[in-house]
From Swiss-Prot:
Its biological purpose: Probable peripherally associated component of the endosomal sorting required for transport complex III (ESCRT-III) which is involved in multivesicular bodies (MVBs) formation and sorting of endosomal cargo proteins into MVBs. MVBs contain intraluminal vesicles (ILVs) that are generated by invagination and scission from the limiting membrane of the endosome and mostly are delivered to lysosomes enabling degradation of membrane proteins, such as stimulated growth factor receptors, lysosomal enzymes and lipids.
Pfam families for the chain: Snf7
Species this protein is from: Danio rerio (Zebrafish)
Broad class of the protein's primary localization: cytoplasm
Membrane topology, as annotated: Peripheral membrane protein
Locus of motif MIT-interacting motif: 187-197
Recorded family membership: Belongs to the SNF7 family.
Knockout or disruption consequences: Reduced cerebellar and forebrain volume. The phenotype of these animals resemble that seen in those after bmi1 knockdown, supporting a link between chmp1a and bmi1. In chmp1a knockdown models, the internal granule and molecular layers were more severely affected than the Purkinje cells, which are consistent with the relatively preserved folia observed in humans with CHMP1A mutations.
Name of the protein this chain belongs to: Charged multivesicular body protein 1a
Gene that encodes the chain: chmp1a
Gene3D superfamilies hit by this protein: 6.10.140.1230
Compartment(s) where it occurs, according to its Swiss-Prot or TrEMBL record: Cytoplasm; Endosome membrane
Region: Disordered, residue numbers: 171-198
One Gene Ontology biological process: cerebellum development
Assembly, per entry: Probable peripherally associated component of the endosomal sorting required for transport complex III (ESCRT-III).
Amino acid sequence: MDDTLFQLKFTSKQLERLAKKAEKDSKSEQAKVKKALQQKNVECARVYAENAIRKKNEGLNWLRMASRVDAVASKVQTALTMKGVAKNMTQVTKALDKALSSMDLQKVSAVMDKFETQVQNLDVHTSVMEDSMSSATTLSTPQQQVDDLILQIAEESGLEVEDQLSQLPAGASALGETSARAQEKEDQLSRRLAALRN
């Protein structure tokens, strides 16, 4: 059982490393998006953005899997602990029977204290196990994410992509709508800032 626990923890660490690698790859693809936008190549930027989002989702999936494996490791750890607790409970029960048969109140009190401690430990272990388990949901890669990533990188880099939107095939992007929304928000903020200054 200890070997199983070790293997589960080792696997969890491997999955976490894969998640970090995927995140690093995603950042690399985002840098390529920026470079493509600087070269006014929106179509390549779109491909790199899709790669970046796919890698990011891949990283999230590796992380979810690592979490699930870690949860199983926690269950195995809890099972091992419960086995030890059950053994201790058996010993406590035998000691309680012995103390009761001799009717020594000090011994009975000491055994009861030990028994209560074991029950509290059992409650803590059960609580930890329940808290470690949570359901994971999978993410899809909607087109809007690609468009948002392109806009975000363009805005961070101070690049204009609106004039390049005409290069995209019809219906291939919602960037125009998103860009208009961003511009509207910026206009509203500018008006509010001007009102505050006056």
